[in-house]
């Protein structure tokens, strides 16, 4: 592969393409990163200048926390974790909780100590969460009385939010503290904490990965600092703006945006406990929200229910909707702008492994490039590589997107899969091309993940469960297109001879074993699953067949 050293004289300013190494460079402002090696993400964010007063608002209770109170709470919780609980640099701490304004405090406290933050989806079943615990081996978990039973058999110590929560958890769970008391306790003034380095792991977030198996992604403090530095370099909103957080904070999309980036900009974030269209629009009106960050299915719902929304809610302060998780079609973008003419729609592209780096739309003019996910993020390099030959390609040629930059994760935890090369290139698993003006277009997904309402569903996991059914000979799971959800899991099932297995029984069999977003919602029966000579499922053939029947 060509040497990645850039030659500015050979870089086309129109699209950022360098002919000497077939690499695309960002057209955005250069990324300025701190030179200090001993620096954690919490310290970096807290050192920023804030013009706003309120950091977070709980939409359910209207409870507010100011920036000054937030940092005081972060300091006190970190002190308790260090001296009372014994959390040290490198220890893993799990957060298993629905959205609350306590989550940013917990996350920032944990990472300030050099401990490693990991999160789990509250909707996951106990067995799914316990598998993740077995892999990441957390020393402590922050959770709620409602979710504590899911980790009761793990034996790990837990911290709850309130004192009274202790009475509501199963016997046998080791409760070592509550967040309310930790935030009130004066710092101990004891020994200085361990020094944290930028290369230390800060977060261990679980991504489905390119093969569909759940993997922990190791991201360093330096990776997260680079993500936040991009927002500081090109702040996409002014500090007086108000955001509504509807996305889950356990996910990279929520964590990177609302625990880190918007906090560094000094903006106010209103946190909803869960997504509900009515509650979201009521919060937009009540708090005069200016910015929404959404996944595409919510955008579609806002289009379909625009007339009811405009009659019931005052959305006059709303100026921007940012969308991620999947590309927006021209029809959806134009449909939204027609219904909400004073609101701009910007979209972006990133992965758990890239920590927010990828591409984004940053202006009204750029948003008119329909179908594109934007220009490369500042500090990002990209290559388009033929997935079969490994040849590096050029403008308007489709291949696998490779990304490089300071935000790219260190790699997978306890997994030898090489998706980050020795030169630091992240193989995204997405088929893309970059046009003459440097805009990135997503064509298809090599990784075969199903994206249901912004959630990633690995087909391999569902296929393994299906094959445990006594009447199923073989099975394949594919993404089936859906206007509201984007995609949902559909199963092709080869029944054993003499079996009278029906669609409902297959759906019920899976629904008892997985989180709601992973449920199979359509089943078709087939004599045999088409496969390559090497035994790999020809999933694309099944997708084409399913779509042809619509």
UniProtKB/Swiss-Prot annotation:
Transmembrane segments: none annotated. GO terms for molecular function: 4-coumarate-CoA ligase activity; ATP binding; CoA-ligase activity. Residues 276-347 are annotated as: SBD1. A motif (Microbody targeting signal) lies at residues 548-550. Gene3D superfamilies: 3.30.300.30, N-terminal domain of ligase-like (3.40.50.12780). Induction: By wounding or by jasmonic acid (JA) treatment. ATP binds at residues 207-211, 215, 347-348, 352, 430, 445, 536. Keywords: ATP-binding, Ligase, Magnesium, Nucleotide-binding, Peroxisome. InterPro entries: AMP-bd_C, AMP-bd_C_sf, AMP-binding_CS, AMP-dep_synth/lig_dom, ANL_N_sf. It is found in: Peroxisome. CoA binds at residues 274, 453-454. It holds the Pfam family AMP-binding. Residues 348-412 are annotated as: SBD2. Its cofactor is Mg(2+). (E)-4-coumaroyl-AMP binds at residues 253, 325, 347-348, 352, 447, 451. It comes from the Eukaryota. The keyword Magnesium applies. It is an enzyme of class 6 (ligase). Carboxylate--CoA ligase that may use 4-coumarate as substrate. Follows a two-step reaction mechanism, wherein the carboxylate substrate first undergoes adenylation by ATP, followed by a thioesterification in the presence of CoA to yield the final CoA thioester. Belongs to the ATP-dependent AMP-binding enzyme family. Both substrate-binding domains (SBD1 and SBD2) are involved in the substrate recognition, and are sufficient to confer the substrate specificity. This is 4-coumarate--CoA ligase-like 8. It comes from Arabidopsis thaliana.
């Amino acid at each position: 592969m060509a040497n990645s050293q850039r030659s500015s004289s050979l870089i086309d300013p129109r699209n950022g393409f360098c002919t000497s190494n077939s690499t695309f460079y960002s057209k955005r402002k250069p990324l300025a990163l701190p030179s200090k090696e001993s620096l954690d993400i919490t310290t970096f964010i807290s050192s920023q200048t804030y013009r706003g007063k309120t950091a977070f608002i709980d939409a359910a209770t209207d409870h507010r926390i100011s920036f000054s109170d937030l940092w005081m709470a972060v300091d006190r919780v970190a002190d308790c974790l260090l001296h009372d609980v014994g959390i040290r640099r490198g220890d893993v701490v799990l957060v298993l909780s629905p959205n609350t304004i306590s989550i940013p405090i917990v996350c920032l406290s944990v990472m300030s100590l050099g401990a490693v933050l990991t999160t789990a989806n509250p909707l996951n079943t106990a067995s799914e969460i316990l598998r993740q615990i077995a892999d990441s081996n957390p020393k402590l978990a922050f959770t709620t009385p409602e979710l504590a039973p899911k980790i009761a058999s793990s034996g790990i110590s837990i911290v709850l939010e309130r004192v009274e929560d202790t009475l509501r958890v199963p016997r046998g769970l080791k409760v070592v503290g509550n967040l309310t008391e930790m935030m009130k306790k004066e710092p101990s003034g004891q020994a200085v904490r361990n020094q944290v380095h930028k290369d230390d792991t800060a977060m261990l977030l679980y991504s489905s990965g390119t093969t569909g198996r759940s993997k922990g992604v190791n991201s360093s403090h330096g990776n997260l600092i680079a993500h936040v530095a991009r927002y500081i370099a090109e702040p996409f909103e002014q500090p007086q703006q108000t955001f509504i957080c509807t996305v889950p904070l356990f996910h990279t999309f929520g964590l990177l945006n609302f625990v880190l980036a918007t906090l560094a900009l000094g903006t106010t974030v209103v946190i909803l406990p869960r997504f509900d269209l009515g509650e979201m629009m009521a919060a937009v009106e009540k708090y005069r929200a200016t910015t929404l960050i959404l996944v595409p299915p919510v955008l579609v719902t806002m289009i379909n229910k625009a007339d009811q929304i405009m009659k019931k809610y005052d959305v006059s302060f709303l100026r921007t909707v940012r969308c991620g998780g999947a590309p927006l079609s021209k029809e959806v973008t134009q449909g939204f702008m027609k219904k909400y003419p004073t609101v701009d729609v910007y979209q972006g592209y990133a992965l758990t492994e890239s920590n927010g780096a990828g591409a984004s739309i940053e202006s009204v003019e750029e948003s008119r490039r329909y179908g594109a996910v934007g220009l490369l993020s500042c500090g990002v390099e990209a290559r388009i590589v033929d997935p079969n030959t490994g040849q590096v390609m050029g403008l308007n040629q489709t291949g696998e997107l490779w990304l490089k930059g300071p935000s790219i994760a260190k790699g997978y935890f306890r997994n030898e899969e090489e998706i980050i090369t020795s030169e630091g290139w992240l193989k995204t698993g997405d088929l893309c091309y970059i046009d003459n003006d440097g805009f990135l277009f997503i064509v298809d997904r090599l990784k075969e993940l199903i994206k249901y309402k912004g959630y990633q569903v690995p087909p391999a996991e569902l296929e393994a469960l299906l094959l445990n059914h006594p009447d199923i000979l073989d099975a394949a799971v594919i993404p089936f297109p859906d206007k509201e959800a984007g995609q949902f899991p559909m199963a092709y099932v080869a029944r054993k001879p003499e079996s009278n297995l029906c669609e409902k029984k297959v759906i019920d069999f899976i629904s008892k074993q997985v989180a709601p977003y992973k449920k199979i919602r359509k089943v078709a029966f087939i004599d045999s699953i088409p496969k390559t000579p090497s035994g790999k499922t020809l999933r694309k053939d099944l997708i084409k067949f399913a779509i042809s029947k619509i």
